[in-house]
Curated annotation (Swiss-Prot):
<feature type="disulfide bond">
    <location>
        <begin position="4"/>
        <end position="16"/>
    </location>
</feature>
<dbReference type="InterPro" id="IPR018244">
    <property type="entry name" value="Allrgn_V5/Tpx1_CS"/>
</dbReference>
<comment type="similarity">
    <text>Belongs to the CRISP family. Venom allergen 5-like subfamily.</text>
</comment>
<feature type="domain" description="SCP">
    <location>
        <begin position="46"/>
        <end position="187"/>
    </location>
</feature>
<protein>
    <recommendedName>
        <fullName>Venom allergen 5.02</fullName>
    </recommendedName>
</protein>
<keyword id="KW-1015">Disulfide bond</keyword>
<dbReference type="InterPro" id="IPR035940">
    <property type="entry name" value="CAP_sf"/>
</dbReference>
<feature type="disulfide bond">
    <location>
        <begin position="168"/>
        <end position="185"/>
    </location>
</feature>
<keyword id="KW-0020">Allergen</keyword>
<dbReference type="GO" id="GO:0005576">
    <property type="term" value="C:extracellular region"/>
</dbReference>
<keyword id="KW-0964">Secreted</keyword>
<dbReference type="Pfam" id="PF00188">
    <property type="entry name" value="CAP"/>
</dbReference>
<dbReference type="InterPro" id="IPR001283">
    <property type="entry name" value="CRISP-related"/>
</dbReference>
<feature type="disulfide bond">
    <location>
        <begin position="8"/>
        <end position="101"/>
    </location>
</feature>
<dbReference type="InterPro" id="IPR002413">
    <property type="entry name" value="V5_allergen-like"/>
</dbReference>
<feature type="disulfide bond">
    <location>
        <begin position="26"/>
        <end position="94"/>
    </location>
</feature>
<dbReference type="InterPro" id="IPR014044">
    <property type="entry name" value="CAP_dom"/>
</dbReference>
């Protein structure tokens, strides 16, 4: 498998380690649903692009302090099935956290993850999970070296101007009586690179 040849800063590529099958690999956990529907893919993409536009136009009033400045330019994201496959294989492992190596031949790949847990079999809406990433903007100060990635890193990846493509995967499973809803989105090229600004201000 060609993914075994892809180099990352650390670890073996997710698709080399676990193979390219998108079947769940959750051990003793009971899988309720695996993967996103076409409709959910479209919703996630639309939500990202609408939020990127809002920020780029200078209409996001939240921040620390707000509002966020408008952007000189920001790519419109398109869906990428390869990024989605890599995200799905990782979600299938039911192991909440970031994988070590998820790059494609084309890009270094960034990642956002979210998990919702409910005690009953309640449906967790993917758009609410994406909204959690958007809401990190309340702690973000444009251009400040004091921003902490563990507080705002999902937001900054969402609006990283140079990112062009996105692909996501999900797993709904039961672990220790809890219903876990796990969402993984991969982004190419990756955001949150060194000291680069998330976007150039207008």
């Amino acid at each position: 498998n060609n993914y075994c040849k892809i180099k990352c800063r650390s670890g073996i590529h997710t698709l080399c380690k676990y193979g390219t099958s998108t079947k769940p690999n959750c051990g003793k956990n009971v899988v309720k649903a695996s993967g996103l529907t076409k409709q959910e893919n479209l919703e996630i993409l639309k939500q990202h692009n609408e939020f990127r536009q809002k920020v780029a136009r200078g209409l996001e009033t939240r921040g620390n302090p707000g509002p966020q400045p408008p952007a000189k330019s920001m790519n419109t994201l398109v869906w990428n099935d390869e990024l989605a496959q890599i995200a799905q294989v990782w979600a299938n492992q039911c192991n909440y956290g970031h994988d070590n190596c998820r790059n494609s031949a084309k890009y270094s790949v960034g990642q956002n993850i979210a998990e919702g847990s409910t005690s009953a079999d309640n449906f967790v809406n993917v758009s609410n999970m994406v909204k959690m990433w958007e809401d990190e903007v309340k702690d973000y100060q444009y251009g400040s070296p004091k921003n902490k990635l563990n507080k705002v890193g999902h937001y900054t990846q969402m609006v990283w101007a140079k990112t062009k493509e996105i692909g996501c995967g999900s797993e709904d499973y039961i672990e220790d009586g809890w219903h876990r809803h796990y969402l993984v989105c991969n982004y190419g090229p990756a955001g949150n690179v060194g000291n680069e600004p998330i976007y150039e201000r207008k």
